[in-house]
Amino acid sequence: MKAILLVLLCAFAATNADTLCIGYHANNSTDTVDTVLEKNVTVTHSVNLLEDRHNGKLCKLGGIAPLHLGKCNIAGWLLGNPECELLLTVSSWSYIVETSNSDNGTCYPGDFINYEELREQLSSVSSFERFEIFPKTSSWPNHETNRGVTAACPYAGANSFYRNLIWLVKKESSYPKLSKSYVNNKGKEVLVLWGIHHPPTSTDQQSLYQNADAYVFVGSSKYNRKFKPEIAARPKVRGQAGRMNYYWTLIEPGDTITFEATGNLVVPRYAFAMNRGSGSGIIISDAPVHDCNTKCQTPKGAINTSLPFQNIHPVTIGECPKYVKSTKLRMATGLRNIPSIQSRGLFGAIAGFIEGGWTGMIDGWYGYHHQNGQGSGYAADQKSTQNAIDGITNKVNSVIEKMNMQFTAVGKEFNNLEKRIENLNKKVDDGFLDVWTYNAELLVLLENERTLDFHDSNVKNLYEKVRSQLRNNAKEIGNGCFEFYHKCDDTCMESVKNGTYDYPKYSEESKLNREEIDGVKLESTRVYQILAIYSTVASSLVLLVSLGAISFWMCSNGSLQCRICI
């Protein structure tokens, strides 16, 4: 009876002891992140670094509308294709849009020389001044300026020609040598375009230019070239057996360009004084134009985001996130989200010694749960929580700032004869994308690992802070909790939390209670030992008596014969 009472007293004392536990926050978040060692780790808080949404619209960029070429392309717009006449008055834009069916380009068949390079030059131009470089009415008095029209470039049902060029032909029966120069006094680069006509027969050559052995020379300080017409029969394209090649050059401020010819020259009428600006570009898109504004435009739609990465489209214009191939880039800011299992108690393992988080603690990441004679409750440790928030916020901002390199990434243009270069370029671009994607994913994996380890370390530090104060005034239960050897009211609990716990004040009471509990345990252990001895002896006696009774019964009924020899 004494042993039973001692055991009950010990259990009752343990049940009513004041306790203080260290724990961490948990919530109903389903956010998951990946680390170097784990995938799909559920965390309490995280931030997304990857933008995957767009509005499906072509918007103004920085308040400036794009130039939508409609059914025209760059060549048709700059040459002045009659089908592109509505574009002639446009002088500024944020970016240029071609569509998948922008077919109105060079109406008279021929090659546009270095067309891809011209597109590249225009990708950095945000406006230009279209001006008459050689006035039609006064520049060519000895040549015909109105007969140079063709059925290949119709307008309103009649033969016509490019609005920015003049097709000079002989006047009456003469095509005298022409020489005309322009000095660039615009203070900026001037884009000049011209053409060279190649008739199909010598008869056409004489009919148009009179001179059988004609030539064209175009020269500036950086451009010098002499052209000879290539007279040859060719298959008809758009009803034309002849061909017309188109050329361009940029004239620097103060430089002079000179045209000299005895035939076959398509002279410039209008030129373009260009204003270069960052953020412009050319995209191919069938998305509709809307009255909206954005800082980043892709062919699929506008992106309004401050995130450092996007997986929408590799071609971007404006202040845009870096394109990566990733489908998920989420950075942990909070802790592992492991709500405690109620059937196993309130506490339990982060950092190896706490099994689950507390959904009841909502005002911090780390904190305490106490239980004493005055009740129980949660309290966050504001200092460690705030330090952690500041540190992680600074880290996230630093990562975003370093990776958030806003820039324009326009597509590159190659002609049909440059497929090898185009394929090589695609491989190089894909290689860069793979490297960027790998770097972004590795960065997030490493930072997530560090963040979760950082939280574990903070919980451990909080635990050690309490343990170093309590010393032997309390015992460690082993699940993140301490059981006091003395009464600890709310004031006492608060002193432990804020680091002002008075160890000497409670040490005497703790010593007495500790010795009493240890004595009870020792006495109960001795009683258990005595009971074990008594039980063993009693069991042995019962076994011997049973064996004797069985032997006597078997001897009496003859089943067992006993002989005693003297």
UniProtKB/Swiss-Prot annotation:
It holds the Pfam family Hemagglutinin. Residues 18-529 are extracellular. GO terms for biological process: clathrin-dependent endocytosis of virus by host cell; fusion of virus membrane with host endosome membrane; fusion of virus membrane with host plasma membrane; viral budding from plasma membrane; virion attachment to host cell. It comes from the Viruses. Keywords: Clathrin- and caveolin-independent endocytosis of virus by host, Clathrin-mediated endocytosis of virus by host, Disulfide bond, Fusion of virus membrane with host endosomal membrane, Fusion of virus membrane with host membrane, Glycoprotein, Hemagglutinin, Host cell membrane, Host membrane, Host-virus interaction, Lipoprotein, Membrane, Palmitate, Signal, Transmembrane, Transmembrane helix, Viral attachment to host cell, Viral envelope protein, Viral penetration into host cytoplasm, Virion, Virus endocytosis by host, Virus entry into host cell. A lipid is attached at C555, C562, C565 (S-palmitoyl cysteine). Disulfide bonds join C21-C481, C59-C292, C72-C84, C107-C153, C296-C320, C488-C492. Major glycoprotein, comprises over 80% of the envelope proteins present in virus particle. The extent of infection into host organism is determined by HA. Influenza viruses bud from the apical surface of polarized epithelial cells (e.g. bronchial epithelial cells) into lumen of lungs and are therefore usually pneumotropic. The reason is that HA is cleaved by tryptase clara which is restricted to lungs. However, HAs of H5 and H7 pantropic avian viruses subtypes can be cleaved by furin and subtilisin-type enzymes, allowing the virus to grow in other organs than lungs. Homotrimer of disulfide-linked HA1-HA2. Interacts with human CACNA1C. This is Hemagglutinin. The gene is HA.
